[in-house]
C-alpha cells in the first residue's frame, strides 16, 4: 500500500522520474518558463523551489548540492549570483503554475510553469 506517499509517480520508474525532473528543473531555471503537463509542472515546482532556497543560502555546501542536481554548472553559478537579489524577500513560492489549453493529441491537461 502506498499510504501517505507524496512523490508523484508520473508513470515512470524512479531513475527515469528523477532524470525527467532534473532536466525540467534545469530548463525552467535556464529559460524562465516552460510548457509541460500539469502533473509534471506540479512535480517540478517543489524541486525548483528547493534549488532556489539553496541558492539564497549561498554556502559552499548548498552550491555543491545544487551542482549535484542541476545539469549545467554555469547555470548554477548564475543562479547563485542573482538569487539573493531576485528572491531575497520571498520565503518560498518562487514558481507559478498557470493552466493552459489541453494538448491536441491526447487531451492531456497542460500548464505553463514560470519563475516569479
UniProtKB/Swiss-Prot annotation:
Q: What is its quaternary makeup? A: Part of the 50S ribosomal subunit. Contacts protein L32.
| Protein name from the UniProt record | Large ribosomal subunit protein bL17
SUPFAM superfamilies, alphabetized: Prokaryotic ribosomal protein L17
**InterPro entries, alphabetically?**
Ribosomal_bL17 (IPR000456), Ribosomal_bL17_CS (IPR047859), Ribosomal_bL17_sf (IPR036373)
Ordered alphabetically, the record's keywords are: Ribonucleoprotein, Ribosomal protein
Q: What Pfam families does UniProt report for this protein, alphabetically?
A: Ribosomal_L17
Q: By its UniProt entry, which Gene3D superfamilies does this protein fall under?
A: Ribosomal protein L17 (3.90.1030.10)
Q: What family does the entry list?
A: Belongs to the bacterial ribosomal protein bL17 family.
Q: Which GO terms describe its biological process?
A: translation
Q: One GO cellular component from the entry? A: cytosolic large ribosomal subunit
Molecular function as annotated in GO:
structural constituent of ribosome
Amino acid at each position: 500500500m502506498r499510504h501517505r506517499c507524496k512523490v508523484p509517480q508520473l508513470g515512470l520508474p524512479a531513475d527515469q522520474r528523477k532524470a525527467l525532473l532534473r532536466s525540467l528543473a534545469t530548463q525552467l531555471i535556464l529559460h524562465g518558463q516552460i510548457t509541460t503537463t500539469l502533473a509534471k509542472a506540479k512535480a517540478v515546482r517543489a524541486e525548483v523551489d528547493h534549488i532556489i532556497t539553496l541558492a539564497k543560502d549561498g554556502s559552499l555546501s548548498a552550491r555543491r548540492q545544487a551542482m549535484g542536481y542541476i545539469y549545467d554548472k554555469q547555470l548554477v553559478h548564475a543562479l547563485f549570483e542573482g538569487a539573493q537579489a531576485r528572491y531575497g524577500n520571498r520565503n518560498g513560492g518562487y514558481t507559478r503554475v498557470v493552466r493552459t489549453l489541453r494538448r491536441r493529441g491526447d487531451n492531456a491537461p497542460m500548464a505553463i510553469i514560470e519563475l516569479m
